[in-house]
């Protein structure tokens, strides 16, 4: 796993995946990238960031420029920083199989199409990073933290399955399938208000 943007979203994604057995090999912030092909201790890196330090303060890894995180070969590459970080000029550098988008619109449409043509699976931002909205809803309805986390996992898993099945069935990009799902749900919700 490589995480581009080790802030709130990036830290939580890295922690969640590490708990599932994934190995973090790279992470970056605005000060640089830390890379270790043998793995980075996620809890220790989070502690470093929580002390207002940078990922490059992590001992036991190679310190690289911030942009170098794009070049790290990995199974899962998580953009969790800002929009349009991957575009036509750098998309060829990305060597991964799965991209759960943690940031909002981290790829240009052209870059997303190019990755799709290379069989890179992209989970759209508003599906993959919906945890905050789901958590707020759970809190609003009086749910506990453990209930909120369970709901987040269940909802994101179910939405991801539905989007990927629709994309496969209709031979479209996952983002298009996700937009269609969202539009259908909004129309349905609006029909209840009439």
PLM region descriptions:
Residues 29-32, 82, 104, 126-128:
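Short, ordered loop/turn segments at secondary-structure junctions
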Residues 60-61, 78-84, 102-106:
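A general structural motif
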Residues 1-73:
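Glycine-rich phosphate/diphosphate-binding loop of Rossmann-like nucleotide-binding domains
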Residues 96-194:
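Adenosine-phosphate binding glycine-rich loop
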